[in-house]
Structure formats: structure tokens, C-alpha cells
Amino acid sequence: MNPVMFNIGRVEFRWYSFFVLIAVLVGFVLALREGKRRNIDKDIIFDMGFYTVIFGILGARLYYVLFNLDVYQHDFLEIFRLWNGGLAIHGGILIGLLTIYLFSKLRKVNMLELTDIVAPSLVLGQAIGRWGNFFNSEAHGPVTTLTNLQSLKIIPDFVIKGMKIDGVYYHPTFYYEFLWCLLGFIIILLVRKFYKNRKSGQITCLYLMIYSLGRFFIESLRTDSLMIKTFKAAQVISVILFVASFIFFIILLFKKEEKVKIKTNKRIEKKENKNDNKLDNEVKEDKKVKTTSTKAVTKKTTKKTSTKTSSKKTSSTKKTKKAKSE
């Protein structure tokens, strides 16, 4: 596969950078929509997203570099060439969570509600970002045959062709992870829609459990894994994240929800206040109209009664006068 989309002079625009950018944009859109649905000020989502993306990418790169110091010590500038690949998602997740934690403390907002907003964006972004690995011809599995790949039925022909590297076919583990992340995204959306009594943080735990479970098994096929002595680093981190998130999910089931105020959308509040004021004014006007109409009716009735009584008095006085004259 050709990793370069196009060139403008000496500047290369690579597929890897393109898919990372698309993943970030899609993630922002999803987070903003969910924030709006929860009536959270979009400035909070923007600020949180900005810092999380920046430090998340830095964390993913730092994690990768630390496991490949022997490569980068000979070419220090290669550390900054992110378009060549070399982002480890676990580093991004860990630093991203730390960033959101610090952000929530500074803004005095609920961290778990923010991570619940981010979780669907992150897993979908991971699915999109894996296509950058495809064009870089990286993150693949062991050697296999064309027949084996075709027998799986779920792998498109263009992916199979792209997995032929130097005349040899490899397992497209990037594609397996793409499908797993896509499935995880659908599951999270369904749980978020139908599990109404969930606690803040359970969506985050669900994301970590789903991704860690899939990554553990897919990593066993990877041939370019980062290693901790004789263990694959991604599998070790996946086990830790799965166990920790599972325990925390159970704890949240029995924990009372503590409502921490998050700055809500001012525009929506203003509109609601205006509508409430309009309704109050309309009710007041209706009351005024009713009171004035009732007053007018009472005045008319008193006038009628007074005229009737006066006419009766005059008639009675006339009768008495006639009687006296007689």
C-alpha cells in the first residue's frame, strides 16, 4: 500500500494523518451531540476535547517511544514524525483519562459524566484510526495464505490485496480490531439508550471492558507488539484495565448517584426562562382581563339592581300619594 495520499511540492500528505484527523473530528461531533443532549455547555466539551486530544496523542506517542528507545536514540527527530505511525492507544487512554481527571478538578465538574460522553467517541475513533495502520502496512498479524483469508468471508478483497506485503500474505489484525471497535460502539449506544438507570461511569467501564477483551485476543496475533520482557505490553495492560473496570462497574451498581453540577448550556436555559416568563405574563394578563370583566359585570348588575329599586320606590310613593288624596 502507498502510505502517501498526495504531495504538494515536498510536503507529503499521508493516509495515517488523514484517518487520525477524521477520527478526531468525528469524535468531537459525537461528544458535542451527547453534551447537548445532556444540556452541558459546549465550551466545556470543546475545552475537554481539545486538551484530551492533544495530551492523548502525546501520551500515545510517549508510550510507543519508551518501548522503542533503541530505535529513536539514533534518530531523535523521528520522535516528532507522527505521520510515520507509532501511536500506542493504551498510552493515549491512560494519559487521556488523567487529563480529564485534572480538567474535572479544575472546572469542578463530574469526571465520570465527562468520560461517559467521551467513551463512544473514543471507540469509534479507534475504529477509524486503524485504517491508517492499513495504509502504513503495519499492525498486521502472522503470515497466512490467500485461501485462509478468503475463507473468513468477512474480509473485503481490497484488504486482502493490501495484506500482500513483499509477496507474502498476512493476517489483517488491524481489520479485526476495526470490526471489534465498531461492534463495541454499537453495544455502547444500545446500552446508553435502553439502560436508563445506569450510574455515571458505567459507560466508561463498559468501553474499557469491551476494548480490553477484544485487544487481548487480537494482540496474540500481532507480530509487532511492544514487549514487557516476555509478555506483550498490550495484553498486560488489557488484563489490568478489564479487571479494574469490571470491579468499578460492580461498585457503581450499589453506589448512590451523587449529582455534581456541570455548567449547563446557557442558551437553552435563557430560552426556557424566556418561555417561562412569557407564560407567566400571559397568565397575569388573563387574570387581569378576567378581573376587569368581572368588575364590569358586577357594576352593571349593581346599576340594574339600583335602578330597579329606585323605580320600585317611585311607584310606591306615587301609590301612597294617590291613597292620601282619595
Segments and roles (model prediction):
Residues 1-284, 326:
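A feature for loop-to-transmembrane-helix boundaries and adjacent hydrophobic helices
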Residues 282-326:
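Intrinsically disordered, polybasic Lys/Arg-rich low-complexity tracts
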